[in-house]
Amino acid sequence: MRYALLILCLMMVGPVTYAAKIKTTEELVHAMQKKYGKSWYKTATFVQKTTEHEKDGTLKVSTWYEALAVPGSLRIDFTPVKDGNGILFTDNKIYVFKNGKVDSNRPFVHPLMILGFDIYRLSQGDALEKLKGLKFDLSMLREDKWQGRSVYVVGAKQGDLRSLQFWIDKKNLYFVRMIRPTGKDGAQTQETQFNKYQRLGGGWMAPEVIFTVDGKTVTTEEYSDMRADVALDSKLFDPQYFGTVHWKE
């Protein structure tokens, strides 16, 4: 009798487990935050080799030093650092620096920061609002395959590789791909890939980032010397100190 009851209970578990599968973007964000919300690093630094693919076929290679404060801030110092040139993303703005001084700034929410990093350190409500503000259609979620792995796709139907959308690895719940229209009247398609993920602190980081337009690679980024939960001066992310405070000389 007990054995029969046990079998019956196990049979009942099947439908419950199936019902618990992720079926909405809200559930996906919740799962991502539940998995990493307490462990994901709050700061990180890395050295980036940036390769720009010029139209004439030549390659322009440069080194950037980058520092993250999650959520919300990313600092990029172009080499040589002493020249004071770079970019700062903070407080939903982008600042461009030349010779240590602000050359321009404007409102900007960085989609790759939100999807790749900030989503784990924002509240669920704030994360969803950011994604809505970026114009992703959160009502659309499906499953697909990418590079041999199962993924969730938010924002586009099966076979649509034009509309604004982002892809999340199903097992590890990290961001792997974004597609969006670009160029005049959205006639071109831009794709961003986060590849070759490695464990970093209590989270992950993709040491290879590829940007393409209409299937042609335009920029690649290769990260090295990746470090998590680094002690960083808050002034690193304050525009008024960009020219005087650095994490890497």
Enumerate the predicted regions with their spans.
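Gly/Pro-enriched, hydrophobic low-complexity segments
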Residues: 83, 147-239
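Flexible, processing/modification-adjacent segments and terminal tails
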Residues: 20-30, 40, 95-162, 182-188, ...
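Sec/Tat signal peptide C-region and signal peptidase I cleavage site
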Residues: 15-19
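Sec-dependent N-terminal signal peptides
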Residues: 4-12
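N-terminal mature ectodomain segment of secretory-pathway/periplasmic proteins
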Residues: 20-101, 139
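Short amphipathic beta-strand/extended segments with alternating polar/hydrophobic composition
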Residues: 61-64, 86-91, 103-113, 168, ...
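Short structured motifs
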Residues: 31-33, 61-62, 123, 137-140, ...
